[in-house]
Amino acid sequence: MTASSQKKDPIEAEANASAAEAARDARAEILEKSKDANTSKAAVSKLKKAEKDATTDARKKWYDFEVNVWITNFNSIEFGPWKRERNRGKSRQFTTDMDIFAEIVENGTRTGVLGYRKEIWKDASGMDKRLVFKLFSDTLNWKASMDMMLGRSIQQTLGARGVPVTTYSINTSEDDYLVYLERSANKWPLLPENFSFFLMEGGEPKFYRFRRDFINLGGDYTLINQHDEHVGHIDGAILTIGGRWRCKVRGDHADPRLIQVMKLFTGMIVFNRKARRHVKALAHDIRDGRIKPNIQRQEADLYMNPRRIR
């Protein structure tokens, strides 16, 4: 062995040692990353399983409530001296012509009431006659409103060649979006009617419809989601004077906004037939030139362009 090769041996040994140490460090780093990745995968898998279990549990539970219609004004909300004045003081939504006609009962306790504007329904005619519902808490705090949109209803009815298509806009206090509930024009004689709507949830629309039951004795409707699953039901009592409906929604769909839409829709069932006849008659009168159409300012506001210059 030459002197030159003997001098290279320490250098080569040091290089080999450095390479081995670098390899060990790289291997340890890879193992650590692999361990972290496995931990993350396990956490994600555990989270997905928990979400799936929660959804499965929710599908087994049902949220239910009752809507009971009163036949007189002799109730604790309206009966008594100065009751109406005090009610108007509790909420600006409680107008002078507000008539409370039903209560919401959950777990045996009244949690809310339904009212409608009597002056513009019973005491009006033509294009001035329309339905406006209000949902209040038991202490008369406003929760939601449901307005018949005559302009849209007549437009759709004329487009459906006389089949009455009633349209309602629903404003809930917890949401930034309006909900539009509309009767389907695809309605054949003796077949059940459908009312469709959608809710925005996390930027994603969720579509639903209320379909009247084929065997319908008390005003029964089934709530169906966009996958054609039955996720709720409105069951009307047969032997009742005013009207009583037991409503239920499957737990995984029991969103507060959906519950409010169902409460308002159930209250509307009482007026549904007269509302259809009213819209159909208006469409015929406008078509034949018997009346000049006009839209009330409150309804016109609902059609305003949100991007207009204010």
Predicted regions span which residues?
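Low-complexity or membrane-interfacial segments used for flexible interactions
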Residues: T2-R310
